[in-house]
């Protein structure tokens, strides 16, 4: 498909927005899902200070702005800011006219019905798109891995979901949600670095800690054993240079931080870890399809990017599942963007073209059309 009539694929995550053209193998634009507003009134007249900034520009001016994330735990909570993010996506990042392209949007599993309707309404009424569709994020990740049946453990910045999918349909009764994801791990790393004597407090410093987390953290196969290794030698220590040139050293924090995914009690949470949540999700499904789910457990999202996470999941789920069960954890290298990639694949299939909600259908039925056509 050429860009002239190509569909646009927009994956709105709690932390990052991924956008591009259907048929491409990676998103063209990836930017933070933030809207920033100046903390103080501009001093100089005629400086042309804007009343809001979006994405990277908001990030780079974060010192003078109040930053807000319109998507919390995967679900849109502030529609005015969300509209600003979409506007920025179309006009500044992709540089396209939305009224000329069909748009595929993604949504969190168990997204409230009113939210899908609001998305649909904004696309047709504010941006005048010719056609649109709303797809569930985890289902797209599964498509991207070349499967139509499996269970997806999707963990991003704001929320983690385990979503069993059979023949392309998510099974809503068995979807589980865990409000523990990348942002919580960043906060936890800030906390345990403070214990080492490094203080990180502001929203700007949180971004530095996020970078440390992404570059140096990993998941231990055996947590207790790794703690022992860290205590008895300095082999696990790594150093990181802060923007001001100061060098800090981190040791057991490297694996203590993501360990919270498996032991949420580290964060003072009573929920099950990601391994147990995945197992519970499988157990909520029909006994006949469990075997297919165990053998097709797909990891997706930025918070599954830690080295060692697939081996640890394999080990933990093996100990929970029936002894003879074949368990396979699939961790595609591109899983950070697999939701977007799945959307790109779906929107460029010839069989999908009749699935779009057209402007005409919307005008006839109103926003509720989305429940009939997108499931």
Curated annotation (Swiss-Prot):
Coiled coil stretches, renumbered: none
Post-translational modification: Oxidation of Met-44 and Met-47 by MICALs (mical1, mical2 or mical3) to form methionine sulfoxide promotes actin filament depolymerization. Mical1 and mical2 produce the (R)-S-oxide form. The (R)-S-oxide form is reverted by msrb1 and msrb2, which promote actin repolymerization. Methylation at His-73 by SETD3. Methylation stabilizes actin filaments.
Superkingdom field: Eukaryota
Subcellular location: Cytoplasm, Cytoskeleton; Nucleus
More info: There are three different beta-cytoplasmic actins in Fugu rubripes.
Enzyme Commission numbers on file: 3.6.4.-
Protein's recorded name: Actin, cytoplasmic 2
In-chain residues carrying the UniProt-annotated modification Methionine (R)-sulfoxide: 44, 47
């Amino acid at each position: 498909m050429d860009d002239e009539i190509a569909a646009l694929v927009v994956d709105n995550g709690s932390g990052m927005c991924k956008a591009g053209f259907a048929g491409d193998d990676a998103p063209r634009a990836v930017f933070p899902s933030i809207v920033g507003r100046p903390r103080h009134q501009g001093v100089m007249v005629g400086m042309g200070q804007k009343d809001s900034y979006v994405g990277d520009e908001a990030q780079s001016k974060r010192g003078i702005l109040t930053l807000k994330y319109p998507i919390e735990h995967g679900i849109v909570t502030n529609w005015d800011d969300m509209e600003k993010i979409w506007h920025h996506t179309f006009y500044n990042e992709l540089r396209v006219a939305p009224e000329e392209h069909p748009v595929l949007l993604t949504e969190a599993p168990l997204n409230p019905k009113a939210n899908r309707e609001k998305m649909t309404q904004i696309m047709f009424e504010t941006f005048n798109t010719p056609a649109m569709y709303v797809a569930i994020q985890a289902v797209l990740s599964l498509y991207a891995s070349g499967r139509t049946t499996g269970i997806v453990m999707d963990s991003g910045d704001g929320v983690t979901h385990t979503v069993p999918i059979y023949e392309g349909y998510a099974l809503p009764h068995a979807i589980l949600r865990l409000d523990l994801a990348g942002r919580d791990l960043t906060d936890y790393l800030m906390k345990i670095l403070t214990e080492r004597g490094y203080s990180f407090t502001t929203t700007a410093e949180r971004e530095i800690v996020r970078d440390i987390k992404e570059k140096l953290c990993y998941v231990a196969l055996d947590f207790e054993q790794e703690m022992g290794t860290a205590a008895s030698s300095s082999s696990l220590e790594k150093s990181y240079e802060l923007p001001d040139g100061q060098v800090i050293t981190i040791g057991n924090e490297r694996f203590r931080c993501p360990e919270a995914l498996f032991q949420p009690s580290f964060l003072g949470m009573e929920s099950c870890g990601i391994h147990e949540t995945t197992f519970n999700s499988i157990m909520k499904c029909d006994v006949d399809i469990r075997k297919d789910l165990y053998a097709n457990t797909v990891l997706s999202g930025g918070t599954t990017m830690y080295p060692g996470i697939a081996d640890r999941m394999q080990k933990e789920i093996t100990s929970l599942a029936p002894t003879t069960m074949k368990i396979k954890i699939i961790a595609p290298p591109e899983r950070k963007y697999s939701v977007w990639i799945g959307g790109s694949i779906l929107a460029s299939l010839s069989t999908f073209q009749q699935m779009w909600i057209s402007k005409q259908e919307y005008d006839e039925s109103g926003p509720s059309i989305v429940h009939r056509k997108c499931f």
